[in-house]
Amino acid sequence: MNIGLVFSGGISKCAYQIGFTRALLKYVDKKDIKAVSGSSMGIFTAYALSSNKFDELEDIYKSINIANPMRLFFNVRVKGLLTRAMNSFFALGDSLSIPLCFPTTNFPILSTKYFWINGEYNPFWKKYIRAAINFPFLCGMPKIIDHKFAIDGGAVDNIPLYPILKMQDEYLTTKENLDLVIIMHFYPRYNYRKEFKTNIPILDIDVSLNNNFKKRHFDFSRDYVDEMIATSYEYGISLSEKLFSKKDSKDNLTERINEIFLSEYNERQWHDSADGFLTVFNTIGKALRNDSDCNKRLF
């Protein structure tokens, strides 16, 4: 089976993705994961999967241990917290076994650019990653990428499914089509069907569902990080059991995905999230995206 994974941005909430992905790997061989994409802080998750650094990523989340948004803002802007985390996590000696894509936002036009990395770590990547994880309200000035101002990719594509579906023939390690895409996001009312028409089975999940959709965007307290990882791990085990307990046809996989979607639909519609606010900017970014020239290979 050929699988693609999509990790949305979500600041501290991306800790949910750690637990869910660890559970998923109990049922899926990592070699079957052919592509990953991540936006904003979701890039950390995608990179951790591709480079086998989930333990290091969990340590980074727990070492922050800040619950107050203003204190977090001070530590990022004044003390360089995010810069230090990136410098220690994205490092020489890393090797990516899964092609990874992430978006940046060209500013002030708000158009989208996607960058692909794979293989041995190249220090050249860091400036692109810094631009892609560059919250305007937290990190200060935009970065300059290819002679253009660039900011956090979550502004234009916080759930980067597009490059996984559209560019797989060029960037994936397999020439076969994907058999399944799993999207891990934090917007309960998200529905990829409104934007994409595809025959590939797609499971989109709000990974905070098993924790009553609890979303404290700026809470990096150690106890809360532990809670997010633990509840999403349980959720991941439950869904993986439903998806992969039987090795059968793609049609049956689609049927089980639809069953999961319908079983969660009503509960998801009763909840909202600040992540929904990004959909306004994401709509603009996608409208301004140049499909013929929005991807760049960095490996």
What is each residue range found by the language model?
Residues 1-37, 47-299:
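Patatin-like phospholipase
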Residues 38, 42:
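Gly/Ala-rich beta-loop-alpha elbow adjacent to hydrolase catalytic centers
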